[in-house]
Amino acid sequence: DAPVERLRTATREAFEGLVNLAIDEAVDFMVIAGDIYDGDCRDFNTGLFFVRQMGRLRQAGIPVYLLYGNHDAESEITKSLELPENVHVFSARKATSFRLDAHRVVLHGQSFRVAATEDNLLPGYPAPLPGWFNIGVLHTALEGNAAHARYAPCSPGELQAKGYQYWALGHVHEPRVERGDVTIAWPGNLQGRHIRECGPRGALLVSVEEDRVTDLARLETDVLRWQLLTVDVSGAANRSPVIRQVGQALGKLLDETPAHLPLAVRVVLVGHCAAHREMRGFE
């Protein structure tokens, strides 16, 4: 495919890949912690695509527990599409719970009613259900994360004090996991969208026994990967060694990347060298 077309379809391809993995792994259920849609996007083909993918999970007998985040709350698509019966949406009016009796798992969550939800939603979440594995689903960057808007702010200590065993968080695009008595996890987004979202992207496959997380496996779903490659060219006398060093660095990056995965790379040259003036006009 042409690079521009591949970029345009990458996010959908990544989501379809996630559904494929869920079916192949025969997961018991899927959790989506918000931002299916991109704000005020009005492309209903995106919504229809999402419904089709949820239908594939329904056919495989996989329930989905979906929480709407800030972008979903402002999306017209969210209000207009009818989802398959296997998709259970957390209410925006108050925190609600869904039980999976066969697995003794209960999920607690609250969707965003409006995009700019700046109140701490956590006090409204119910107490943990004794003897069950309690999962909290929340769309938040937590407090003190300057890189993200202050939506549904709360602290890690508040999450831990709630008494749930696992927190499935959305909003933050970078993957991050904190393990301990309570597991707090952002899987990040499924597909990097631009150069500020570099490296592998994907989801988390969580394994649980009784009341504890036994394994967290990273599932890579990106179909095109962004990378920022910094090359130190200090001391280069002319552009020839610069080109050679960049080529070597790119070769190493390609060796470390799955063969099927296209790369979009920004190369940054650092260091003082005599080749600086020559390189300024080089393309």
Feature map (PLM): residue ranges:
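His/Asp/Glu-rich metal-coordinating catalytic cores
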Residues: F29, D40-D215
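Accessory, non-catalytic peripheral segments of nucleic-acid enzymes
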Residues: L219-E283
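A short, flexible beta-alpha/helix-coil linker loop
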Residues: D35-G39, A141-E143, H272-A274
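Domain-start "cap" segments at the beginnings of catalytic or binding domains
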Residues: D1-P3, S207-D232
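Short amphipathic alpha-helices and their capping/turn segments at secondary-structure boundaries
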Residues: A14-E25, R99, L122-A127, L254-T257
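N-terminal active-site segment of His-dependent metallophosphoesterases
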Residues: D1-L48
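Conserved residues at the C-terminal ends of beta-strands
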Residues: A33, G170, V270
